[in-house]
Amino acid sequence: MRGGIGNMMKQAQKLQEELKKAQEEIAKMEVTGESGGGMVAVTINGKHEARRVSIDPSLFEDDREMVEDLVAAAFNDAVHKLEQESQQRMAGLSEGMNLPSGFKLPF
């Protein structure tokens, strides 16, 4: 029995280290979201901070509200992509751990 608890503690410690490493990797990631068929692109990092915004010059000839909407849509697309990538990386950590059904990482 004692060995089982010790192994479980080692496994939990290893998971904690892997989780920390994955979070650090995610924080360094950059993803780009697009809208308007690529006419607007927003790049964010893993901390959801905007790093770059690119707007096709032809959009400045159109109305301002449309450009604002496209920037917001591109930012939201980038956030969605970051969340998907984060979930995929975290899912790999829980494989083979016999976690209860519905139990997800991070804690």
Curated annotation (Swiss-Prot):
Pfam families: YbaB_DNA_bd
Keywords of the record: Cytoplasm, DNA-binding
One Gene Ontology term of the molecular function aspect: DNA binding
One GO CC term on file: bacterial nucleoid
Superkingdom assignment: Bacteria
Self-association state and partner proteins as the record states: Homodimer.
Similarity-based family: Belongs to the YbaB/EbfC family.
Function: Binds to DNA and alters its conformation. May be involved in regulation of gene expression, nucleoid organization and DNA protection.
Descriptive protein name: Nucleoid-associated protein Mlg_1509
